[in-house]
Amino acid sequence: MKEIQVLEDLISEEMEDSDKYMDLALEYKESWPELAKVFYDLSIAESGHRDMLHTQVVRIIEKYRREHGEPPAPMMAVYDYLHKKEMSKAAMIKSK
């Protein structure tokens, strides 16, 4: 589905931005604590955006199930792959 691909691309962008901001927060933690806090807050905000987009992916899949039954296996395989990749990246960002 085109919508899922668009959302997955946006989720990936949000993850990259969250990671970038977290790296900057760590870089400036000692020398510029207030700036580091801004970067930390931006990282958290990007994670929130990611969660909002993911919720929409889940809703699209649920709607498809209600209207058509189980989604095609290839579609779910791609979703499962991307979801696992995103969750792994999110865990890595949180562990910093």
Task: Kindly give the residue locations of the regions a language model identified.
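Non-heme di-metal
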Residues: M1-K96
